[in-house]
């Protein structure tokens, strides 16, 4: 088992510290010094996030993009830790710094530090599955308006929302997730069900994937993606 313990003073150096196997492909943006990221057998990445965390995939995706992976929230019996709860199996995709084209999201890690509201400075698609203590599933398109960091009036609208139990989390259950951005049609597909289909009038043509969670114990495995360049 490979383990990485994070602390606040190394957050800015984190991409250079992920040396073990599968973690070479990822960078961690974490709010808490108690965060841990662990590799388990079968290429599972195990995440304990006492506060906000984004696990960024290091490669930029461009053009028509399909991303697939399995993920779950782990809830253990007889564990009183605050993060041992069923909530927040979230993700960002096609994320970029729209105001600084030369920068990747990783360069903004020291500024954002895993804090959720600071992600509003990025342009991206966001799906929060089982957020707000597993009461909502919501889709948004972030515009990169940095005013949203401090002023809720400038934050992106909820474009699609579910609150029924069929679209909320089940504990310890592996979901298969497929994200698409194809010719401006953005889809989120979970276990074969299309729960988001959004035609973006100004689609995001390139960016990065980030697995997002907070106050939870999450796991991710079998991550793959394909891109077809646009000409």
What are these regions (language model features)?
Residues 18-231:
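Extracellular glycan-recognition regions
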């Amino acid at each position: 088992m490979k383990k990485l313990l994070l602390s606040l003073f190394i957050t800015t150096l984190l991409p250079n510290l992920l040396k073990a196997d599968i973690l070479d492909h990822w960078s961690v943006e974490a709010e808490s010094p108690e965060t841990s990221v662990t590799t388990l057998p079968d290429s599972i990445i195990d995440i304990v996030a006492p506060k906000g965390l984004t696990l960024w995939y290091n490669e930029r995706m461009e053009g028509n993009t399909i991303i697939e992976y399995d993920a779950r929230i782990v809830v253990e019996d007889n564990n009183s830790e605050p993060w041992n709860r069923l909530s927040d199996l979230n993700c960002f995709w096609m994320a970029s710094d729209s105001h600084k084209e030369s920068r990747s999201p990783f360069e903004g890690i020291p500024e954002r530090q895993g804090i959720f509201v600071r992600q509003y400075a990025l342009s991206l698609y966001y799906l929060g599955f089982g957020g707000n203590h597993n009461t909502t599933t919501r889709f948004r398109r972030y515009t990169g308006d940095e005013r949203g960091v401090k002023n809720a009036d400038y934050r992106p609208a909820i474009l699609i929302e579910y609150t029924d139990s069929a679209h909320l989390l089940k504990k310890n259950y592996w979901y298969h997730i497929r994200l698409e951005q194809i010719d401006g049609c953005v889809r989120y597909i979970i276990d074969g069900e299309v729960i988001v289909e959004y035609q973006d009038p100004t689609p995001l043509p390139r960016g990065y994937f980030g697995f997002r969670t907070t106050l939870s114990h999450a796991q991710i495995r079998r991550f793959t993606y394909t891109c077809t360049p646009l000409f």
